[in-house]
């Protein structure tokens, strides 16, 4: 399954392949698999920039990611909880093969060639 981070206008910011696949996955399971993999990859390298869906504690926004104040392991479960909260608050939405996931419990058929787009929404200033 291919994961793409995109803007609301459709610009692709980052694309990577997700290792965890089952034939049917809920939106919650897709988010969980994505968060687990990106945190695992970051913790293995412990770089300066975390390229993840949600902002870790003690990090600041950087170009296409989050600048970490110090090299430390990120807790994937905490990131997963924050991502689910962000989804429910409409902080982002996801498209599975061009179909929008409406709830965390909605289930989709998943194939190797399935593309999932995560689209982060930017709140309007003053609105």
Give the location of each predicted region.
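Ubiquitin-like/PB1-type beta-grasp interaction modules and other compact soluble beta-rich domains
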Residues: 1-127
């Amino acid at each position: 399954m291919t994961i793409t981070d995109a803007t609301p206008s459709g610009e692709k910011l980052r694309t990577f392949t997700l290792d965890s696949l089952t034939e049917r996955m809920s939106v919650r399971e897709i988010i969980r698999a994505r968060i687990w993999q990106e945190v695992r990859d970051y913790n293995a390298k412990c770089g300066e920039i975390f390229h993840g869906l949600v902002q870790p504690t003690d990090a600041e926004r950087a170009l296409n990611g989050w600048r970490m104040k110090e090299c430390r392991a990120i807790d994937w479960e905490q990131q997963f909880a924050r991502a689910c909260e962000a989804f429910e608050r409409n902080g982002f939405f996801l498209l599975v093969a061009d179909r929008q996931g409406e709830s965390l419990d909605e289930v989709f058929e998943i194939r190797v060639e399935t593309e999932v787009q995560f689209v982060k929404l930017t709140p309007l200033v003053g609105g």
